[in-house]
Amino acid sequence: MSSPWSTVISMHFQSFWLCLGLLFISVNAEFMDDDVEMEDFDENSEEIDVNEGELPSEINYKTPQPMGEVYFTETFDSGRLAGWVLSKAKKDDTDAEISIYDGRWEIEELKENRVPGDRGLVLKSRAKHHAIAAVLAKPFIFADKPLIVQYEVNFQDGIDCGGAYIKLLADTDGLNLENFYDKTSYTIMFGPDKCGEDYKLHFIFRHKHPKTGVFEEKHAKPPDVDLKKFFTDRKTHLYTLVMNPDDTFEVLIDQVVVNQGSLLEDVVPPINPPKEIEDPSDKKPDEWDERAKIPDPSAVKPEDWDESEPAQIEDLSVVKPDGWLDDEPKFIPDPNAEKPDDWNEDMDGEWEAPRISNPACRIGCGEWSPPMIDNPKYKGVWRPPMIDNPNYQGIWSPRKIPNPDYFEDDHPFLLTSFRALGLELWSMTSNIYFDNFIICSEKETADRWAADGWGVKILVANANEPGIFKQLMAAAEERPWLWLIYFVTAGLPIALIASFCWPRKVKKKYEDSEYKKTDICKPQTKGALEQEVKEKKAALEKPVDLEEEKKQSDGETVEKEEEAEPEEKSEEEIEIIEGQEEGNKSNKSGSEDEMKEADESTGSGDGPVKSVRKRRVRKE
């Protein structure tokens, strides 16, 4: 049978491991994106293994080479901007000082976690307009092949306000990259953008109205994940856009789907306009009654309705208190105040002492007036009750007419073709890093390109990742409430161990009645022994209530078992008493008073005394 202590300890350990497990799960949940679903890659696609600890001793970086058909690639590893054109345009409706696209671009390695031989395009200027573009190897025509656009971004200094998105410039006759500016016609705009605490991942495409020929921007729904860490962790992230001929799209960050949907259903405003619209020439008739309730015209004000009674009146039952001083002011100048020595009446005006409460106004000062109370006769202005309007016609709205510009586009994937890629950006933060652009139609080609470029960067970054302690500290700096989790996680096992090693002492009830084997044998006289034997016999003859004994503490139960030892001990004590009587025959002449004194004493007596074990029986 297990002891109570072992049961308690077992329960403590179960509670400890349960709490520790819950805390561990809550902490780890902060480092995971709960809403992100990992993409199921094709079996033939190459997976990017970025597990820590698998980094080879030396990184032999090689410039990625495209496999398969591509429309555009750029790695910047050559160190030259061959094929790229800097804009010389000016923004419209802007001051001349800031209208010029004079932002500086450089080709550099990463500031942190650099890979030898790998370079990227870096935006170097703050608070300036930047514009640079390059022509594709061949225009992309939306037909029966998917569109895949992929590139890398690293906000090396974080980001306050600025973007890192790209524009796919429409294939128009007047396209001139030297005149590339914010109003240049584009087909798709894609990439991260941030200002203040608004973190965005744009996917915007321009859809042409088939009847009017007017282009309208369509914005994809925002991602369901928190984008903040992609702007703040200063790591290189891979952004991918996939548009399929079946009018679906996917947006990925670091090969993980963060947004997906239909071009027909998941964009704002919708692709297809409504079939009917409100008639702009329709007007509400003058007699149209929109009142749901009206005053009852048949209601009459009661004759006894008095509108002249005020809402409150003076309480006439209150009288002015004795000692009220009508002529005394409530505040008086402070008699102890003195004009400052540096007070200049020409500059500061006439000096006046500060005012204090009048000490004479203990009961009250000034003009006395009785307090105001609610007037029981007050009824206010009479108004007729409201009833349903029999002429109510409802809220008027213009009639619907067929939409003259209605159309139905069942295949919005067929957008305007594009033939150039451009970056047209304004940023308040410099050192934004771009690398490894690719435009293709096969996901396997884009995945292999990512493995050869971005995958190597991730291997290096993971190898340089700080230890778990530094990661926990960094996480706590970003989320201060994690300090409480750390404290509880570290303090809980210490508290449990302390409670096991130094348990709280429980005071025993009836400690005086507990049998102790270490009790010292005390000599007793005949009278004391006789009295004790009588008490023991009376206790043994008394019935024991088992139900009450079960309610006592464990220590008390053990005590009762010892007290319930049968008559064997009582007979031994009787024999001791008889021996005591034989030894005391020579002292029969002792007086009764002396015997009482001997009975009350614990160690004195005329006759020889034999030591016996003293037992006490608790009296109920």
From Swiss-Prot:
**What S-S linkages are listed for this chain?**
161-195, 361-365
Question: What topology does it adopt in the membrane?
Answer: Single-pass type I membrane protein
Ranges of Basic and acidic residues composition bias in the record: 275-294, 529-558, 582-593
Q: Which GO terms describe its biological process?
A: ERAD pathway; protein folding
User: What molecular function does GO assign, one term?
Assistant: calcium ion binding
| Keyword Isomerase included in the entry's annotation | no
Query: Compositional bias of type Basic residues: which residue ranges?
Result: 611-620
Residues that span the membrane, as ranges: 481-501
- Sequence ranges of Acidic residues compositional bias: 559-581
The segments labelled Interaction with PPIB in the record are 327-360
Q: Which residues lie on this side of the membrane: Lumenal?
A: 30-480
List cellular component terms (GO).
endoplasmic reticulum membrane
- Keywords from the UniProt entry: Acetylation, Calcium, Chaperone, Disulfide bond, Endoplasmic reticulum, Membrane, Metal-binding, Phosphoprotein, Repeat, Signal, Transmembrane, Transmembrane helix
Phosphoprotein in keyword set? yes
Span of the secretion signal?
A: 1-29
Chain ranges on the Cytoplasmic side, renumbered to this chain = 502-620
Modified positions (Phosphoserine) are 570, 586, 589, 591, 601, 604, 611
Record-linked SUPFAM superfamilies: Concanavalin A-like lectins/glucanases, P-domain of calnexin/calreticulin
* PANTHER family in the record: CALMEGIN, CALRETICULIN AND CALNEXIN
Q: Which family does it belong to?
A: Belongs to the calreticulin family.
Q: Give the multimer and partner information.
A: Interacts with PDILT. Interacts with ADAM2. Interacts with PPIB.
Protein name (database record) = Calmegin
Recorded source organism is Canis lupus familiaris (Dog)
